[in-house]
Amino acid sequence: MTPTELNLKAKALLETHFEDIVLSGEISKITLHGSGHWYFDLKDERSSIACAMFKGANLKVGFKPAVGDFLELCGSVSLYPESGRYQFIATSMKKAGFGDLEAQFLALKERLQKEGLFDPLFKKSLPKFPKKVGIITSKTSAALQDMLKLIHQKEYFLAKIYIFDALTQGNNAPFSLIQALKKADDMDLDVLIIARGGGSREDLFCFNDENLAREIFKAKTPIISAIGHEIDYVISDFVADFRAPTPSAAIDTLFYSKLDIEQSLDLMEEKLMQLWNHKIQNYENLLLNLSKFFKFNSLPKIIDEKIKQSHNIEKQLNHLLANQMRYNELKLDKLQNAYLQHENFFNKSKKFICIRKNGKIANLEDLKSDDIVILSSQTSQKEAKIL
């Protein structure tokens, strides 16, 4: 018997014996295809099954299903001979209440909210110019690479970045995230970002863990929650000090670019000049009013005294302005020095060679004789064999 023959027999057996079945479960993944067909996974506590509902059938459904929906389906089981993969073909669909994941999320959210963990009174302010920034995420994630790339593009070299590796998906992820959070919170950081890129509701569910939420609330370090995409909400978003819709948005919120800093200093100088001119104008008007009021020859001494007071005030204002300008110049010099130091580092990094084996970054001490590796820099790459 060939695989095709076996699959055809299995298909006939399934379609004969599994007709008009009522199937209940929770959607864990779904794709609303451009063709109009719906493809999704339905799960219970222990298992899941691939399902499909074709356009002709789903036009009769009065809602768009989503991850977390608990559904009751009617249909039959079928099998594709080409792949040997079987799935449930739904002919009707109706909602049967909230799914387990959604129910757990809403129950925990309501309980923590009543306890006050989401209260704005407990939110810590984010630093304006952070110098020590921690990022908790998977060290191999695309989200981390996107964040580091954006920091480099902004030319913000004042901050030192600390990476805390943690699982961001699966049953062991909450414990891993908590351990990383405790370690980071003991390092006297200015701010901490908990980040993960997009994924299904199940993929992100580790950030709905109650113990993780309580550790975030207890942390002394200001925390930004940057999980998934803008439409994704998890418990850590509500308990953190600030919620960023994406990991990249967290970087945009936290870091100024070099141009932003220069514009801020220019604006500060402009405001100081406006304040100085305003004060001078006020005192000039005061002197003018006094000179009009005191018209008698017996009062020239008083007028002279007021003029001297005005001159003294003008000197004080000039002195204050000069001090502020010197302070701004020193601050700008520090920013420029920091930029030049880090710019030199990044220029040197262009000469670094990266070793990859089987598509992954490899440590030199892990390589063996006859291993085939790829040596790459920012400008080229070569294949090499370890002797």
From Swiss-Prot:
One of its GO terms (molecular function) is exodeoxyribonuclease VII activity. InterPro entries: Exonuc_VII_L, Exonuc_VII_lsu_C, OB-fold_nuc-bd_dom. Its EC number is 3.1.11.6. HAMAP family: Exonuc_7_L. PANTHER family: EXODEOXYRIBONUCLEASE 7 LARGE SUBUNIT. Bidirectionally degrades single-stranded DNA into large acid-insoluble oligonucleotides, which are then degraded further into small acid-soluble oligonucleotides. This is Exodeoxyribonuclease 7 large subunit.
